[in-house]
Amino acid sequence: FAYVDFSYKLQTSGESALFLGLKGGGNFYSADPTALSAYLSVGDPSQVSLSKFNPNIGAGAYFKATNYWVSFSIPRLFNVKRDSDNLAVTAKDRVHTYLGGGVDLPVSNGIYIKPSLMIRKVKGLPTTADITGMVSWQNQFDIGLSIRTNSSMALMSMISLGMFDVGYAYETPTDNGLSQLNLRTHELVLRINL
């Protein structure tokens, strides 16, 4: 895939700003199953070469105030089919819509509780939500828990080291059907604040 992102900041007041974003690009799909070697040289007529570029665009808005934020985005505005006239199976990239918000609540000197909610809607699928609660100390160290409805939960942490933020997250399924699979993940994050 290849995309170009553009964002613009509108200062709405001294302490708040609206960020508007656009993205454009697309996904490249290429497969040549005829180049695979097989034990038997019997041809399969459904194995045809595929080379395709699917363009797409996306848009989003993010409003940030002193102690709260709200966001809305549609990263890919078009439904895109990945198929060919000779293929038996088709796949479709569906439009994902995200709506989110969060607040920073002061608890005591330098300690904040930061609850947030991200709602995800995909046509034809149940709506899901990520419910997150973080505790922040001096805006230097954050630790928290996130629950994705009917899917998973995660433990997260982030430490600020000057212009770098370093984080770790561990995610595990909560759905009984998924918990039998080894779908646990460990994630490391390195963010550079320019």
Where are these regions (language model features)?
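Subset of outer-membrane beta-barrel
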Residues: 1-194
